[in-house]
């Protein structure tokens, strides 16, 4: 998904239950499951980023931007990653996304 392996290795097992949904294109379900994980582990910035990716692909623009904002708050590197991450293509032209990533 979005974050590099070096970041995901901190708690990859958290995303293991969601990854198959993402891989199957079931983005709304993946986002919903990811939100449950965030409730359990709000300290894990990669969860916010990956949920934002799923929400973007599921057409949940406002939710995607909000979760990306949280991810960036937890790790500034998410801002640069989001610029080139194709998961954000559906929302890339949104003013809120542009403002968030500084474009």
Regions found by a protein language model. Name each.
Residues 50, 84-85:
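Canonical tetratricopeptide repeat
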């Amino acid at each position: 998904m979005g974050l590099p392996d070096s970041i995901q290795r901190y708690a990859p097992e958290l995303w293991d239950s969601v990854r198959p949904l993402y891989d199957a294109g079931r983005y709304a379900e993946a986002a919903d499951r990811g939100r449950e994980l965030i409730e359990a582990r709000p300290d894990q910035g990669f969860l916010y980023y990956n949920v934002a990716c799923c929400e973007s692909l599921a057409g949940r623009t406002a939710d995607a931007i909000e979760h990306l904002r949280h991810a960036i708050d937890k790790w500034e590197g998410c801002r640069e990653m989001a610029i080139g991450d194709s998961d954000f293509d559906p929302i890339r032209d949104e003013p809120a996304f542009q403002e968030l990533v500084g474009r």
